[in-house]
Regions:
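Short beta-strand-centered aromatic/proline hotspots
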Residues: 172-177
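C-terminal motif of bacterial Sec signal peptides marking the signal peptidase cleavage site
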Residues: 15-19
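Sec-dependent N-terminal signal peptides
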Residues: 5-14
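N-terminal "domain-start" segment
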Residues: 21-159, 181-184, 197-210
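Short coil-to-beta strand junction motifs in C2/discoidin
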Residues: 188-193
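N-terminal secretory signal peptides that target proteins for export/translocation
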Residues: 1-2
Length: 210
């Protein structure tokens, strides 16, 4: 009888302990997705690449810009977008890459509307780095993020850039305009990017929608 009581108590204690463990996991507080809109990121053709670094405590979109030579996530110049992973494409005057896979960033472009991208696919693959002569995001009309009709550069519909940063955070980016102040049907001031983004400030978590 005593043995049965002891066994019963052990089972009850085990169940209670397991339940408490579950509660601890369930009460983990996750930071909310950070959504932002960057207007007029000026990255003219022939200038330096403008580098962005996504960090857990983003204050304003403008705070994304970094001057670090090799601690950056994504960079823009003209219509070209590069990632801090792989090797230089050969376009000239590119920033240094991290060169170590664990602290590199990874990038891809999905054939999906920005709002429909709720989780990033697995990006940690060398296929999602830049290569010599070939940036991961093609800088070619109709193949990357834009269409060029010879007069006007337009972001392609249903294209979303996904990024895993050098610090293992996930971001999605939706291009809105390539012209200053995002004015419709203007070509007066090109290379002024406007885009929306969603950034998950929780380390290693690839969901991109609350």
């Amino acid at each position: 009888m005593k043995n049965k009581i002891i066994i019963t108590l052990i089972v009850i204690i085990s169940i209670l302990g397991y339940s408490c463990g579950d509660k601890d996991e369930d009460t983990t507080v996750k930071k909310p997705i950070v959504e932002g809109f960057y207007t007029n990121l000026h990255a003219p053709e022939g200038g330096d690449f403008v580098k962005l670094k996504f960090i857990a405590d983003i204050s304003t979109p403008e705070a994304l810009i970094t001057n670090s030579e090799n601690n950056w996530d994504i960079a823009f110049r003209g219509t070209m977008i590069i990632v801090n992973g792989g090797v230089k494409t050969g376009s000239g005057n590119e920033p240094e890459r991290a060169l170590i896979s664990s602290i590199s960033s990874y990038i891809d472009i999905l054939n999906m509307n920005f709002n429909d991208v709720t989780i990033s696919p697995d990006l940690v693959n060398e296929e999602n780095w830049d290569k010599a002569g070939q940036p991961k995001i093609p800088n070619i009309s109709g193949q990357g993020w834009f269409e060029d009709d010879g007069t006007y550069i337009t972001p392609l519909k249903d294209k979303t850039i996904v990024l895993r940063t050098t610090d293992n955070y996930y971001v999605k980016i939706g291009m809105y305009s390539y012209y200053k102040d995002a004015l419709p049907e203007t070509t007066d001031d090109p290379a002024y990017y406007s885009f929306k983004y969603s950034f998950n400030p929780n380390y290693g978590i690839s969901t991109l929608d609350d």
